Amino acid sequence: MSLIEQLNWRYATKRMNNAKVPVEKVDKIKEAIRLAPTSFGLQGFKVFEIEDAALRQRIYNEACQQPQILEGSNILVFAAYKKITAELVDEYMQNTAKTRNIPVESLDGFRAAFDGAVAGSEEQNFLWNAKQTYIALGTGLIAAAEEQVDATPIEGFNPAALDEILGLSPQNLGSVTILVLGYRDTVEDKYAAASKVRKSTEDLYVKL
């Protein structure tokens, strides 16, 4: 299928059939998320893979008991850094220098510009990083569609409770969104055969 056909195929699956997604497909989706663009390339977030059944149940209880949490194959929790610390920036600069085989000192000017761009309160840092997670989330949704894997993004959960469950606060992290991977239950999910509702091209785009 073409990209547009894949995007027409996908939808926010409400019920899944408990079938496991092959590891190679999950790995491709994860790699797409890793390669997603972010501002400065910082990737100011972590992605937690929930494999423990007890953790999954606790997340389900704090996520409005949405059935996909229990019925899906894979659960990914996106958590953004609350504060862009000097340590995070040091790691980023070292990784850049190593990857591009250049002296880290050659990045001093870039670092100064970077430090100025991300200067701000913890709230501002978290909101900025949270926005970046949505770019990665969207990339993951497209990659899942390409692999014919259903994917449901979830924001309906108690962030404070999820942070506590996963021990995020001591790691300078806060939960942002959840991505469930799996396969649609065409019997139980009434939306599986429903037509996709979107604005028309004319309504969405404004030419100036």
PLM features per residue range, with description:
Residues 1-208:
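Acidic, surface-exposed loops and disordered segments
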